[in-house]
Design a protein with these regions (language model features):
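Interfacial helix-loop-helix junctions of multi-pass membrane proteins
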Residues: 39-45, 102-116
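Generic alpha-helical transmembrane segments of integral inner-membrane proteins
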Residues: 14, 29, 33, 64-69, ...
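Interfacial aromatic-anchored transmembrane helix boundaries in multi-pass membrane proteins
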Residues: 1-4, 32-66
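Alpha-helical transmembrane segments and their helix-entry boundary regions
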Residues: 24-28, 51, 84, 114
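Alpha-helical transmembrane segments and their cytosolic interface
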Residues: 116-153
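Structural signal for the C-terminal ends of transmembrane alpha-helices
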Residues: 18-19, 69-77, 140-144
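Hydrophobic transmembrane alpha-helices
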Residues: 1-25
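Short helix-perturbing small/polar motifs within transmembrane alpha-helices
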Residues: 49-97
Length: 153
Protein backbone atom coordinates (compact mmCIF):
# COMPACT_ATOMS: atom_id res chain seq x y z
CA UNK A 1 0.00 0.00 0.00
CA UNK A 2 0.95 3.62 -0.50
CA UNK A 3 0.66 4.32 3.22
CA UNK A 4 2.02 1.65 5.59
CA UNK A 5 0.47 0.65 8.90
CA UNK A 6 3.02 1.49 11.60
CA UNK A 7 3.36 1.68 15.36
CA UNK A 8 3.92 5.43 15.24
CA UNK A 9 0.34 6.36 16.09
CA UNK A 10 0.31 3.91 18.99
CA UNK A 11 3.52 5.49 20.28
CA UNK A 12 2.11 9.01 19.96
CA UNK A 13 -1.00 8.00 21.90
CA UNK A 14 1.04 6.29 24.61
CA UNK A 15 3.49 9.16 25.00
CA UNK A 16 0.80 11.82 25.32
CA UNK A 17 -1.46 9.71 27.55
CA UNK A 18 1.48 9.11 29.89
CA UNK A 19 3.25 12.49 29.75
CA UNK A 20 0.29 14.82 29.28
CA UNK A 21 -0.29 17.83 27.04
CA UNK A 22 2.91 19.83 27.49
CA UNK A 23 5.56 17.14 27.82
CA UNK A 24 3.80 14.76 25.43
CA UNK A 25 3.61 17.44 22.73
CA UNK A 26 7.27 18.34 23.27
CA UNK A 27 8.20 14.67 22.90
CA UNK A 28 6.26 14.44 19.62
CA UNK A 29 7.92 17.62 18.31
CA UNK A 30 11.34 16.19 19.22
CA UNK A 31 10.51 12.92 17.47
CA UNK A 32 9.55 14.76 14.26
CA UNK A 33 12.62 17.00 14.48
CA UNK A 34 14.92 14.00 14.90
CA UNK A 35 13.35 12.37 11.86
CA UNK A 36 13.54 15.59 9.86
CA UNK A 37 17.30 15.91 10.43
CA UNK A 38 17.79 12.40 9.16
CA UNK A 39 17.74 10.05 12.12
CA UNK A 40 16.00 6.82 11.08
CA UNK A 41 13.02 7.12 13.43
CA UNK A 42 10.18 6.95 10.91
CA UNK A 43 8.65 3.78 9.43
CA UNK A 44 11.12 1.22 8.06
CA UNK A 45 13.98 3.04 9.81
CA UNK A 46 13.83 6.07 7.52
CA UNK A 47 14.38 9.75 8.18
CA UNK A 48 14.97 13.06 6.46
CA UNK A 49 12.94 15.86 4.98
CA UNK A 50 12.05 13.68 1.99
CA UNK A 51 9.85 11.57 4.26
CA UNK A 52 8.07 14.66 5.60
CA UNK A 53 7.39 15.85 2.06
CA UNK A 54 6.41 12.39 0.80
CA UNK A 55 3.10 10.50 0.97
CA UNK A 56 3.30 9.91 4.73
CA UNK A 57 4.28 13.49 5.58
CA UNK A 58 0.75 14.63 6.36
CA UNK A 59 0.32 11.89 8.93
CA UNK A 60 3.64 12.72 10.58
CA UNK A 61 2.93 16.46 10.67
CA UNK A 62 -0.55 15.56 11.94
CA UNK A 63 1.06 14.00 15.01
CA UNK A 64 1.51 17.52 16.41
CA UNK A 65 -2.18 18.49 16.49
CA UNK A 66 -2.94 14.90 17.48
CA UNK A 67 -0.76 15.27 20.56
CA UNK A 68 -2.43 18.57 21.39
CA UNK A 69 -5.94 17.10 21.02
CA UNK A 70 -5.16 14.02 23.13
CA UNK A 71 -3.32 16.04 25.76
CA UNK A 72 -5.92 18.80 25.97
CA UNK A 73 -8.80 16.32 26.27
CA UNK A 74 -7.03 14.41 29.04
CA UNK A 75 -6.12 17.64 30.83
CA UNK A 76 -9.80 18.65 30.94
CA UNK A 77 -11.09 15.26 32.14
CA UNK A 78 -10.31 12.66 34.77
CA UNK A 79 -7.73 10.05 33.87
CA UNK A 80 -9.85 6.99 33.15
CA UNK A 81 -9.66 4.35 30.47
CA UNK A 82 -12.83 5.72 28.86
CA UNK A 83 -11.54 9.29 28.68
CA UNK A 84 -8.16 8.11 27.41
CA UNK A 85 -9.89 5.99 24.77
CA UNK A 86 -12.01 8.92 23.58
CA UNK A 87 -8.91 11.14 23.50
CA UNK A 88 -6.92 8.59 21.50
CA UNK A 89 -9.75 7.98 19.03
CA UNK A 90 -10.07 11.74 18.49
CA UNK A 91 -6.31 11.86 18.02
CA UNK A 92 -6.46 9.05 15.48
CA UNK A 93 -9.09 10.96 13.51
CA UNK A 94 -6.92 14.09 13.54
CA UNK A 95 -3.92 12.13 12.24
CA UNK A 96 -6.02 10.51 9.52
CA UNK A 97 -7.54 13.84 8.49
CA UNK A 98 -4.12 15.49 8.11
CA UNK A 99 -2.80 12.45 6.26
CA UNK A 100 -5.75 12.24 3.87
CA UNK A 101 -5.65 15.94 2.98
CA UNK A 102 -1.89 15.75 2.37
CA UNK A 103 -2.30 12.58 0.32
CA UNK A 104 -5.12 14.08 -1.75
CA UNK A 105 -2.99 16.98 -2.90
CA UNK A 106 0.37 15.19 -3.12
CA UNK A 107 -0.97 12.23 -5.10
CA UNK A 108 -3.60 14.32 -6.90
CA UNK A 109 -6.39 12.06 -5.66
CA UNK A 110 -10.08 12.85 -5.46
CA UNK A 111 -11.51 13.26 -1.98
CA UNK A 112 -13.04 9.80 -2.35
CA UNK A 113 -9.68 8.40 -3.41
CA UNK A 114 -7.95 10.02 -0.45
CA UNK A 115 -10.60 8.64 1.89
CA UNK A 116 -10.30 5.11 0.52
CA UNK A 117 -6.49 5.23 0.37
CA UNK A 118 -5.63 7.22 3.45
CA UNK A 119 -8.40 6.80 6.02
CA UNK A 120 -10.66 3.75 5.70
CA UNK A 121 -7.88 1.12 5.67
CA UNK A 122 -6.62 2.49 8.99
CA UNK A 123 -9.83 2.83 11.00
CA UNK A 124 -10.02 -0.64 12.55
CA UNK A 125 -6.32 -0.89 13.36
CA UNK A 126 -6.47 2.72 14.59
CA UNK A 127 -9.20 1.86 17.08
CA UNK A 128 -7.17 -1.14 18.25
CA UNK A 129 -4.12 1.11 18.75
CA UNK A 130 -6.30 3.67 20.58
CA UNK A 131 -7.53 0.94 22.93
CA UNK A 132 -3.95 -0.19 23.61
CA UNK A 133 -2.68 3.37 24.11
CA UNK A 134 -5.52 4.15 26.51
CA UNK A 135 -5.23 0.91 28.45
CA UNK A 136 -1.45 0.82 28.82
CA UNK A 137 -1.09 4.60 29.03
CA UNK A 138 -3.52 4.99 31.93
CA UNK A 139 -1.91 2.14 33.88
CA UNK A 140 1.64 3.43 33.34
CA UNK A 141 0.73 7.05 34.12
CA UNK A 142 -1.12 6.10 37.32
CA UNK A 143 1.79 3.96 38.50
CA UNK A 144 4.33 6.68 37.71
CA UNK A 145 2.21 9.17 39.66
CA UNK A 146 1.83 6.77 42.60
CA UNK A 147 5.61 6.27 42.66
CA UNK A 148 6.11 10.06 42.57
CA UNK A 149 8.12 9.70 39.38
CA UNK A 150 5.58 11.72 37.42
CA UNK A 151 3.54 14.56 38.87
CA UNK A 152 -0.20 14.47 38.52
CA UNK A 153 -0.85 16.31 35.28
Amino acid sequence: PLIPITGQTLAIGLVVTILGLKHGTYAVLLYILLGAIGLPVFQSFTGGLGILFGPTGGYIIGFIPTAIVIGFYLKKTRLTFTHALVANILGMLVTLAFGAVWLKYLAELSWTGALFSGVIPFLIVGVIKAILAAWVGVIVRQRLEQANILRTI
